[in-house]
Amino acid sequence: MQTIDLRGVQPTRTAFERLVPRPVVDVQAAMTVAADLIADVRKRGAAALREQAERFDGGVPASVRVPVAEIVAAVDALPGGVREALEEAIARVREATAAQVPPAAVTRIGPGAVIEQRWQPVERAGLYVPGGKAVYPSSVVMNAVPAQVAGVASIALASPPQREFGGAVHPTILGAAGLLGIDEVYAMGGAGAIGALAWGVGELGLEPVQVITGPGNIYVAAAKRVVRGQTGIDSEAGTTEILVIADDTADPRYVAADLISQAEHDEAAASLLVTDSPAFVGRVAAELETLAASTRYAERVRAALGGQQSAVVLVDDLDAAAAFSNAYGPEHLELQTADAEAVLARIQNAGAIFVGPHAPVSLGDYLAGSNHVLPTGGQARFSPGLGAYSFLRPQQVIRYDREALRAVAGRIVALSGAEDLSAHGEAVTLRFEERA
């Protein structure tokens, strides 16, 4: 990993971003391809989805809409340990997510004047579960549970067909969907799948959804940008990121293992260690060398750790470490310091924060109860991770009686006149006119 020495330096956020550039992910460049694929699905429906499956996934599904019997069979075929782990993950995420649903609030502005704020779930959600270099049944859990907790009545799930399973959705994905009671699953992936969820495909019985969530590759991100406005989206997910703030009290083996755990996702994954201890850097480097050599995806891990997006950052103190992290806005932030709570108090921007030596990112990926669908690419500076709120809309309900309206009628007339919109004021005053 490259080393960046910021001791004695107070760079700006722009300088931070230049020092540790993120992977080059040009979503805009992929939008033309994504838009064309979506347009083809809107025009030709299931035929376009099958052609795209053969072209991009190497397998054509026997049925784009997965028969319910296959989902039931996939649940039955889940290995015992996997099923138990999924059931535990579902329970934990459900419990933690329940706290995200806000109660309705009623405000009495004055006599006879009431404003209620209520939270309404979208009617229908589309969940995208990626394929590619790994299989992600955990993403089924992380997308579906918040939608269910929010009260979404109808859920459709899309996942790419898998060549090794004859064009079918991976059976572990189907099993996870079945455990969650989802019986509307489609063997489709990429930009075409996002378009199908957004506009529907009548011949498949696929009705349009109001929100699409879930991570994917650059074309999925581009497709989300294309369909925004037709439907809501959660975010444009990029490659995974981990930033570890550690001092010399941390266990270098733990830190190295956590950096590697995210590097194994993709050659473009970002792994950063920010520390005030040069001696600790050497200990972590030795552990990285040992652990990376023994991992299943050693070549991928080495490529990620050696990429421009990964680095060891030396800083003067932990205040400077927190400042760097806030400027970077990591997807995953680990705090492994003698007083992690003190560092936490200085953190503003992160998708999720893992405090202490026994809260690795891997815990959050599967069984912490938190959600692992998190903002990447610096979006943690302004966007949250996935939650029940991703499927909820606040609505204001206004109730005024006659006297409450009369009390503000004059001011409404004054303001509407100032805006040269006299009919606004007249819509109020006519309510108090005598009618013959």
Curated annotation (Swiss-Prot):
Positions contributing to Zn(2+) binding: 262, 265, 365, 424
GO molecular function: histidinol dehydrogenase activity; NAD binding; zinc ion binding
A family per Pfam: Histidinol_dh
Highest taxon of the lineage: Bacteria
Keyword annotations from UniProtKB, A to Z: Amino-acid biosynthesis, Histidine biosynthesis, Metal-binding, NAD, Oxidoreductase, Zinc
Any GO BP annotation: L-histidine biosynthetic process
Active site positions, chain numbering: 331-332
InterPro entries: Ald_DH/histidinol_DH, Histidinol_DH_CS, Histidinol_DH_monofunct, Hstdl_DH
Annotated SUPFAM superfamilies: ALDH-like (SSF53720)
Chemical reaction(s) catalysed: L-histidinol + 2 NAD(+) + H2O = L-histidine + 2 NADH + 3 H(+)
Cofactor or coenzyme needed: Zn(2+)
Amino acids binding substrate: 240, 262, 265, 332, 365, 419, 424
GO cellular component term of the entry, any: cytosol
Enzyme class: oxidoreductase
EC number(s) stated in the UniProt entry for this protein: 1.1.1.23
Cofactor binding note: Binds 1 zinc ion per subunit.
Pathway(s) where this gene product acts: Amino-acid biosynthesis; L-histidine biosynthesis; L-histidine from 5-phospho-alpha-D-ribose 1-diphosphate: step 9/9
HAMAP family (UniProt xref): HisD
PANTHER family: HISTIDINE BIOSYNTHESIS TRIFUNCTIONAL PROTEIN, HISTIDINOL DEHYDROGENASE HDH
Job of this protein: Catalyzes the sequential NAD-dependent oxidations of L-histidinol to L-histidinaldehyde and then to L-histidine.
Family membership noted in the UniProt record: Belongs to the histidinol dehydrogenase family.
Protein name: Histidinol dehydrogenase
